[in-house]
Amino acid sequence: MSPARSSDVLVIGGGIIGLVTAWRAAQRGFTTALVDPEPGGGAAQVAAGMLAAVTELHYGEETLLGLNLASARRYPDFVAELTEASGQDLGYRRCGTLAVALDADDRAHLRELHALQSRSGLESEWLTGRECRRLEPMLAPGVRGGLRVDGDHQIDPRRLAAALVTACERAGVSVHRTWAERLTVVRDRAAGVVTSEGTGLGAGQVVLAGGSLSGQLAGVPDDVLPPVRPVKGQVLRLTVPQRYAPFLNRTVRAVVRGGHLYLVPRENGELVVGATSEELGWDTTVTAGGVYELLRDAHELVPGITELPLTETRAGLRPGSPDNAPLLGPTALDGLLLATGHFRNGVLLTPVTGDAMAHVLTTGELPDEARPFSPRRFGATALTEQPA
């Protein structure tokens, strides 16, 4: 092993969560390094980029709602700052979201969601099917009703990731384009990593932000190994020809045959359709069945989609945790912190995660809004449990 090069903060993982953590750490004056063979890759290259704190509300996730809302409120300033730091457009759109129902059961479910949103103090408006189609004329005639949520926006995750890579480089982050092979532990304290090339990288504090791979790093003691599992998602990208524009004016969501479907229109004419949710380990195969189900359900929602060119099919891995919420902050191993397990909310939670990690790296304590998401909420038995 070659001699260790040291930094104040070493971030393992160059997805959007690792990148924003490294950027914020460097802004705080820490000498910062990041290890990833392909910074800006990973789940961000597949994600749709919905900033849907309101429409993503689920029963039993009210605590996560607070973190989601805190991050959503920060997005406009975050986008302005990152745009200035990187010189790049992030594809941020305040176009709103429309969640619709195609049958009576879905309509009842949306009514329940509307009631939950109201009890939680969230703004959403119930629309009839006719009102939904007035907003989005391409919707199927069978749409029974919907929820209009003007506060749920979108961003292009690929542009976000690229901008964060540039911002990190401009802020002086040392980027090592290689794999972190093993955590180095010295006298019961995380002290760095050894890369796949045999290089030792030392650090005062180590942040494990490896997404779905966070639980795979060698050398991490079992009692602090993050309980993160991969959840496969298949996503399609289509192109809207100019003669059909505007195809959709805002993000459209629905539950079709029990599965969650979304259509996210970009300003450049791209339409993102997703996503499956599959517990299949590390498999990232795009399957005929997955593509068929997405197109079938999307056609039921927006029949005209079959006229659009299909330009890309991708599958990625979401980092799921036992309670579908992120793990943020210090672990029981001194010097090792986590920023992982964001599941379906990684893009939405990027601003608040960066702020929370910068705060804890500086003070040793999580800010109030992030305290419920300490890794220490999981006991030793929970660390090895996986959902059936």
Predicted features along the sequence, with ranges:
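Helical element adjacent to the flavin cofactor pocket in flavoenzyme catalytic cores
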Residues: 147-197, 201-205
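Active-site substrate-recognition segment that forms the wall
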Residues: 23-28, 37, 49-50, 55, ...
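Short beta-strand to alpha-helix junction loop
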Residues: 66-69, 100-109, 147-166, 285-289
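Conserved Rossmann-like nucleotide-cofactor binding loop
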Residues: 17, 40, 213
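N-terminal Rossmann-like FAD-binding beta1-loop-alpha1 element of flavoenzymes
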Residues: 7-33
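Dinucleotide-binding Rossmann-like beta1-alpha1 core, especially the glycine-rich loop
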Residues: 50-131, 135, 298
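C-terminal catalytic lobe of FAD-dependent flavoproteins
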Residues: 302-388
